[in-house]
Amino acid sequence: MAGQVVQYGRHRKRRNYARISEVLELPNLIEIQTKSYEWFLREGLIEMFRDISPIEDFTGNLSLEFVDYRLGEPKYDLEESKNRDATYAAPLRVKVRLIIKETGEVKEQEVFMGDFPLMTDTGTFVINGAERVIVSQLVRSPSVYFNEKIDKNGRENYDATIIPNRGAWLEYETDAKDVVYVRIDRTRKLPLTVLLRALGFSSDQEIVDLLGDNEYLRNTLEKDGTENTEQALLEIYERLRPGEPPTVENAKSLLYSRFFDPKRYDLASVGRYKTNKKLHLKHRLFNQKLAEPIVNTETGEIVVEEGTVLDRRKIDEIMDVLESNANSEVFELHGSVIDEPVEIQSIKVYVPNDDEGRTTTVIGNAFPDSEVKCITPADIIASMSYFFNLLSGIGYTDDIDHLGNRRLRSVGELLQNQFRIGLSRMERVVRERMSIQDTESITPQQLINIRPVIASIKEFFGSSQLSQFMDQANPLAELTHKRRLSALGPGGLTRERAQMEVRDVHYSHYGRMCPIETPEGPNIGLINSLSSYARVNEFGFIETPYRKVDLDTHAITDQIDYLTADEEDSYVVAQANSKLDENGRFMDDEVVCRFRGNNTVMAKEKMDYMDVSPKQVVSAATACIPFLENDDSNRALMGANMQRQAVPLMNPEAPFVGTGMEHVAARDSGAAITAKHRGRVEHVESNEILVRRLVEENGVEHEGELDRYPLAKFKRSNSGTCYNQRPIVAVGDVVEYNEILADGPSMELGEMALGRNVVVGFMTWDGYNYEDAVIMSERLVKDDVYTSIHIEEYESEVRDTKLGPEEITRDIPNVSESALKNLDDRGIVYIGAEVKDGDILVGKVTPKGVTELTAEERLLHAIFGEKAREVRDTLLRVPHGAGGIVLDVKVFNREEGDDTLSPGVNQLVRVYIVQKRKIHVGDKMCGRHGNKGVISKIVPEEDMPYLPDGRPIDIMLNPLGVPSRMNIGQVLELHLGMAAKNLGIHVASPVFDGANDDDVWSTIEEAGMARDGKTVLYDGRTGEPFDNRISVGVMYMLKLAHMVDDKLHARSTGPYSLVTQQPLGGKAQFGGQRFGEMEVWALEAYGAAYTLQEILTYKSDDTVGRVKTYEAIVKGENISRPSVPESFRVLMKELQSLGLDVKVMDEQDNEIEMTDVDDDDVVERKVDLQQNDAPETQKEVTD
């Protein structure tokens, strides 16, 4: 027997076919959300308040500082927030200190800064009662970027950009005459040397001494019209502020505010880290020949001689000297924007491949401290040096799509950015109020207006592109949504502009972003999913774990390092399936490995790292596809995406053939209930589990406090499915931390269970499975195998109108008693009532407009008071196709203190209707390999083909769906599933390390089946065997959310569009089917004139004809001729609005008055014409 038995959770054992042992546990799959939010509360908020403090008034007398903050207790708990449509949030209170410098007085006060939304334990937010997820955003990292571009003459040119987190961009570029230009914040270009002069390098000689002599610099100096620092400052000021009179002081302050003011310019810690890394001498000197010795500035000793070529080992040796500023120079700048001296490191090297022995200077930024978040003059000089080095062939250009240059903004950072916007708006208000208020009586509370802060937070959660309504179709959808990475959103890309390169799979995605799971359609490649083992580091770069190889023994160690994409570029990484001996050494001399995106074979001594697991490449959803390695990637993509659309079934069942990922995905999704502490189960019932904590002190275990876990019962999920939790532990069980206590929807015994295991045959049957259609046995309908529960919510608001308040009542005008049979005394449907389409759920009446009353009515009104006022019914009825059983009714009253109701609403009634949907013809089904189809026929059980032992199969699939699609994984799953069913076991076949062909065939033989997995099938209708043996097995099939009940729709009479009077379209509007231009051609081709006429008139926009037709049908008369369609009148009005005089003439050239014609007049005129047997009026348009 291949494989070993592995325990998944408390209740499930699986035979696992993996050959590679797991060296690292999967991390908590939603920590990308929870960790980021924790960081925000712990550090992000304080950082924000520090950035903005102190706020000073224009005179500098008043100073306002934010000292500390605390979060209070939420007003409503989580469940209550959902029920009341409230936001789950806690009050944020900030300690504020006001210092009056004249008197030295200090006033401290705690100020309320609004309610701050809290994250739930499962990584979501409850906003206005709905669960939402904040998707992480993939953006370009702030840094220095160098690009290569080919100009129109085919010459290689370079450009460079310094991109901050916020602030002005700085760009360098060359032109056809080899002059180097700079652009400040996307304005017109200036010669590069102008900026250098403005920084304090006044003369040409100083600039040449600094950067080294080369022709590009000489050309640029020739082009440069300025001669000293002052002229350069004025030149820059004129470019940035054209039309304003330039002065040196203004120019200095402008340049300072653009680049060196921390409030205006921010590289962020990630930008500083990337800039230092890029401009550091280590990478730039690699493989270069020194033209001068490297000297230790502190001791004066020569570390490396002139003429040495620096390889990787040599650089590593002198790393400490480079870090301690070898060959550093300090420049005192006079008349510059910044008065501080500038320190740089410069080393001369020989230009590569140059016979004349020319040299160029490599300048480093001398490693500014990580606290320096602004750009420094040293950064600008070093980046210019890098640019000139590139022109000499030293250095590398950047790949923008490399994950070393793209980073994640997770919840915490997105919130922080939004909060910063709110605070900066508030800062303006505070400054204004400081100058108005009296300093004697002023308090921090009076200065602070919290509106802008609350508004920006509300806007972010309510309407940001990255704050999304959680996809709650099933636990996998929930989990994937929390791990989603989007390149769209504010500050990101747009669908229309995103190029092919951005969307493509990049080698740096390995182990960081899933290459499979991404939507089909316009968002392909822009929305991705985090790989299973990946995590996000402090700078927002995605890291993936690798096993370290000992450099001396070349054996795999237990040490696991997390590497970012640019760190990985320096190492050679072996595949996870490389063969190892018992000491952890590579068995083969040549090992398959990766280096910078090349898959090659290298000697085992060259290995630096090894993959942790074969599934580290793919995301959680993709890792749930068994035999993924046998599927084509396009189909695997569909398989991963369709699992997220599976509807939770009434009786879920975990797959016989899984991957071992089902348990982890279910546990971390947030749909299951997991133990927060180790403990013993004391009480279990359907809606609550009580666990007594077991605490260990000094080696002795004793009982602690009692934890209460409420279970959600038959709640409506975000996608209208049934959200129900079932306990799977018993009283007395000892549970560990994070163990599953209760299954959520689509879960069975602690494992994800999106579908059911059914017996499938690959065969055709009377052509019913043409084009991927699915033929199904009636047993699956009768036994509720694919029955799902759906809950829909309907609400009715009782408002105040101009004519008086609406009210809920049983007393409704013109409604029979039988129609009110389901309503209680209040006029609201009772719980448990079975309602059909069109039944009344809430009896509500609205006052009608009072028309001019006659004398008699006024008398009655005077005698009986209000009673004579008319009301019209505005009932809440069951929409089409939404009938079911009333599950719950909630009533919110303003009088009873429900402050969550919106203004003008006195009462709100919510009715929940539950439907049990059995599977139908027209429902969409799929497997896990992208094999999808629509049910075309449900065959009686007795007519289904049956196995030799008499068991009928459940589903027939078309064999033609397999070869062209190349998803062979489904065939292997089919055979292994049948063997597992016969053996009574569950199996796990992890991705890229699962059962191979031999394992599958040996398991089939072990189960006593034929080795080819085929069997004789008998036709259920005739009892004859089919001609050939057929592949029959067990496949895991899912029912998808695309159900025919939601799509099929028919209209008799319904609403019409206001202007054109044509029927509306779409199921939601109860619309009609559009009879379009091509359909009209078809009827014209047949010469079906009368059919065409009625389609274009009565059945469309002939308002008068519609009424007359209805009348004629009711009275049993002949249908009269049509009148003028409304669209013709609209056309006339359109032409008249263009200033054209349009008239309608009859055959005798008499004008037909169309403008003020009343509908009734038209009808009368038509009727007259018809009675006189006059020829039909002809319409012609004249100018």
Swiss-Prot record:
UniProt keyword Transferase, yes or no: yes
Xref: InterPro entries: DNA-dir_RNA_pol_bsu_external_1 (IPR019462), DNA-dir_RNA_pol_su2 (IPR015712), DNA-dir_RNAP_su2_dom (IPR007120), DNA-dir_RNAP_su2_hyb_sf (IPR037033), RNA_pol_bsu_bac (IPR010243), RNA_pol_bsu_CS (IPR007121), RNA_pol_bsu_protrusion (IPR007644), RNA_pol_Rpb2_2 (IPR007642)
Any single Pfam family the record assigns to this protein: RNA_pol_Rpb2_3
Catalytic activity from the UniProt record: RNA(n) + a ribonucleoside 5'-triphosphate = RNA(n+1) + diphosphate
**What Enzyme Commission number(s) apply to this enzyme?**
2.7.7.6
Which terms does the UniProt entry file under GO BP? DNA-templated transcription
**Recorded family membership:** Belongs to the RNA polymerase beta chain family.
Q: How does it assemble?
A: The RNAP catalytic core consists of 2 alpha, 1 beta, 1 beta' and 1 omega subunit. When a sigma factor is associated with the core the holoenzyme is formed, which can initiate transcription.
Please identify the protein, giving its name as recorded: DNA-directed RNA polymerase subunit beta
The lineage is: Bacteria, Bacillati, Bacillota, Bacilli, Bacillales
Per UniProt, what is the name of the gene that codes for the protein in this document? rpoB
